[in-house]
Regions:
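Generic alpha-helical structural context detector
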Residues: 186, 209-213, 228-232, 255, ...
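Basic phosphate/pyrophosphate-binding loop/patch that engages nucleotide-derived ligands
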Residues: 133, 232-239
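Short, surface-exposed beta-strand/loop micro-motifs that present aromatic residues
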Residues: 58, 253-275
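Active-site-proximal cap/lid insertion segments
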Residues: 1-205, 212-222, 271-280, 289-295, ...
Length: 332
């Protein structure tokens, strides 16, 4: 989070940071409880704050006309990095220093760092919303906030301490709900009812058609489904199925599909192939309506749904030029 530069569209934007290799452990002869052991990992120009300032300036410069702003915070992704003065509010946590023997960078107070990184984003969003109000355009501005995937222990993230996933199974890189299920918040005064909620299930490929719908532009038919009707509590089209796959560098290949049966039950099928075992993996099946935390595999009870899941998995993808990312080795 202290890179040497950022990109603003096509413009290269230098930061006042010396290069810091992102994966280096604390030397084994260093004292992890000595603050001086971490001095070499510190930098000054925090990228998240630069992003926030750029967003604020953009809004000020475009407040007289409709605008689109995509603001992508990298935090709280590893490494654990935050300006020192923002740690103070969380230094009461009981801590074990993270020495980064596995990955990313060490930190003397990893729990405080992660909490402060999240609070930094919270503060930034608050500043953006306050500016919209000051400029008198908050009532005309739709704000959508979401994230990309579930939590991970990489880089010293303590998922158990923060209860990052609640009851959901899996983490980042898993295709269980804990890896891919993310809440999405939307605020649009006078258009979206405050405090309302929707059970509509969308995926990131629905964002572009939603934005196109807002702009009055027709999106290509292969780019998902607009969820604008769900935001406005109108009749919403739904996906007949949603498909995911993930290829781990450690030789694990995962597929998942979510679909409905004739009774409108929401099902989720997950298949994980491990190159090291070379076995034909079982497809797990979960009834997400009664088992949203994916605790009970009911694949043996519904063989017809397993066949349907296999067909959707095969039909939902095209071949990759990287052979390892195909699933030719699996029977239909």
């Amino acid at each position: 989070h202290y890179p040497t530069h950022l990109w603003e569209n096509e413009r290269w934007f230098p930061l006042n940071n010396a290069y810091l290799y992102p994966h280096q452990p604390l030397p084994r002869d260093a004292d992890p409880f000595d603050p001086s052991s971490y001095e070499s990992y510190k930098r000054d120009d925090y990228a998240q704050d630069r992003l926030t300032e750029a967003a604020l300036n953009f809004i000020k410069s475009n407040s007289e006309q409709p605008f689109f702003l995509y603001l992508a915070f990298a935090a709280p992704h590893a490494a654990l990095q935050i300006p020192e003065d923002e740690l103070n509010q969380y230094l009461h946590f009981e801590e074990t220093p993270y020495t980064a023997q596995r990955n990313y960078l060490p930190h003397p107070t990893p729990r405080a760092a992660r909490a402060a990184m999240i609070s930094n984003i919270d503060s930034a969003v608050g500043r953006l919303m306050s500016l919209l109000s000051e400029l008198g355009i908050d009532q005309d501005t739709l704000i959508i906030f979401s994230s990309d995937n579930g939590p991970t222990p990489e880089g010293g993230g303590d998922m158990q301490f923060f209860d990052s996933n609640g009851p959901f199974r899996g983490y980042k890189r898993d295709l269980y709900e804990g890896g891919i299920r993310m809440p999405t918040l939307a605020r649009w005064p006078g258009r979206i009812e405050a405090g309302s909620s929707s059970s509509h299930v969308s995926a990131f490929w629905d964002l572009m058609p939603t934005l196109a719908d807002l702009a009055g532009v027709e999106a290509p038919s292969n780019d998902g489904i607009s969820f604008l009707p769900a935001l406005l509590q109108e009749d919403q089209a739904r996906h007949e199925s949603l498909y995911w796959e993930f290829h781990n560098v450690r030789g694990s290949h995962s597929q998942a599909v979510r679909f409905f049966d004739s009774q409108n039950t929401s099902w989720k099928a997950v298949r994980i192939y491990n190159e090291r075992t070379g076995l034909n993996p079982e497809i797990e099946l979960f009834d997400l309506d009664s088992d949203p935390y994916e605790t009970t595999n009911v694949s043996e009870t519904y063989p017809e749904l397993i066949m349907r899941a296999k067909q959707i998995m095969a039909q939902s993808r095209t071949r990759s030029f990287i052979d390892a990312w195909n699933f030719d080795f699996l029977p239909l």
